[in-house]
Amino acid sequence: MPTPSLQFITPHTPELLQATRLIFQEYAGQLGIDLGFQDFDAELVGLPGDYAAPQGALLLALVDGEVAGCCALRALHSADYPNACEMKRLFVRKAFRRFGLGRQLAETILDAARIAGYSHLLLDTLSDMESARALYEDLGFEEVPPYYHNPIAGAHYLKVDLNA
């Protein structure tokens, strides 16, 4: 059996941006919560929006040409941490889980944040996202006080220092 081909791409064509919208919607659907408090619909319409380079990053993971996962990065001007950014929308489709793709996406976004010159990367996650929380801990993230209002019960706020 041949080894699957893995690519990380920045969506730049209308077709790839539409593929990004679809996987973001799939991500939101699996959360089972309303992301309206994050202006999710406006985010979808405006892609790449805040995730555009040079201050942001938007990644799709393709396995044998099929969209398997995504992750994004944006500047975070409202945090109590100087020169901070935020990781958003880390998601791997079920068929592609348990192969380390989530880790690769997260590490690629961490590298993009370092290259962009950020000092801190923050994210929020939910209590029931156990695999993601274990990954974040393994990558050196630590729990911090809330850096924005999230009305969803069980939200956790994490930070990693990029200069460490």
Report the location of each language-model feature.
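Active-site acidic-Proline motif in GNAT/NAT acetyltransferases
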Residues: 93-99, 127-128
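Conserved G/P- and acidic residue-centered "switch" motifs that form tight phosphate/ATP-binding loops
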Residues: 65, 100, 117
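Acetyl-CoA-dependent GNAT
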Residues: 7-88, 93-94, 106-108, 112, ...
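Charged, low-complexity surface patches
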Residues: 17, 102, 125
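C-terminal "cap" of GNAT-fold acetyltransferases
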Residues: 2, 7, 11, 119-164
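Residues forming the Rossmann-fold NAD(P)(H) cofactor-binding site
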Residues: 99, 103, 107
